[in-house]
């Protein structure tokens, strides 16, 4: 069996048999993987503290014919404050679900991995509006999984766009005044500019943006529609996010 060491975050965990756990880990080197942690349900197990959701650590895994098997590891951070605060937990769980639905097993995506880790740290620090942070992450998720939105040129005629009031949800980008408006959404021009800013700006800089509630609602409408359309299933956490917003 091959022995592999990689950083990673537990995005989902499930009890398996009497004492074991199944883990879904977003790793730096292998992408999203499924692993079994033998005996991890026992509180005295060396794997017990390593196998909780949102645990970020360095993991040593064996790769056999089937599942990976977790051998040992070392915690970098467990993002524990996210587990005790409902709002933080909901947003962090949503991030994990996005990773789960957007990636195939063992599909390496280092750029997305870096954005994911950064976003979890920023949620934990409370330094930035969670809502803006999540919208920015959604746009980067779309970009790094092949569905990035285009804002600088019309998706149809390719003419340069300074701003637009229409997003094509089929072709993932802005539409100029001369091209047909179909299979998309009319939005405020301020929303268009906000989308472009969040798409192009690093996550730790999105705090610079101040938006009205109308623009925030339109941002959510655009990203949630596309995410629900292009991936394997609609994120269940979206409903909880709507509940928190209300």
From Swiss-Prot:
<dbReference type="Pfam" id="PF02565">
    <property type="entry name" value="RecO_C"/>
</dbReference>
<keyword id="KW-0227">DNA damage</keyword>
<comment type="similarity">
    <text>Belongs to the RecO family.</text>
</comment>
<dbReference type="GO" id="GO:0006302">
    <property type="term" value="P:double-strand break repair"/>
</dbReference>
<dbReference type="InterPro" id="IPR012340">
    <property type="entry name" value="NA-bd_OB-fold"/>
</dbReference>
<dbReference type="GO" id="GO:0043590">
    <property type="term" value="C:bacterial nucleoid"/>
</dbReference>
<dbReference type="InterPro" id="IPR022572">
    <property type="entry name" value="DNA_rep/recomb_RecO_N"/>
</dbReference>
<dbReference type="Pfam" id="PF11967">
    <property type="entry name" value="RecO_N"/>
</dbReference>
<dbReference type="InterPro" id="IPR037278">
    <property type="entry name" value="ARFGAP/RecO"/>
</dbReference>
<keyword id="KW-0234">DNA repair</keyword>
<dbReference type="InterPro" id="IPR042242">
    <property type="entry name" value="RecO_C"/>
</dbReference>
<protein>
    <recommendedName>
        <fullName>DNA repair protein RecO</fullName>
    </recommendedName>
</protein>
<dbReference type="GO" id="GO:0006310">
    <property type="term" value="P:DNA recombination"/>
</dbReference>
<dbReference type="InterPro" id="IPR003717">
    <property type="entry name" value="RecO"/>
</dbReference>
<comment type="function">
    <text>Involved in DNA repair and RecF pathway recombination.</text>
</comment>
<keyword id="KW-0233">DNA recombination</keyword>
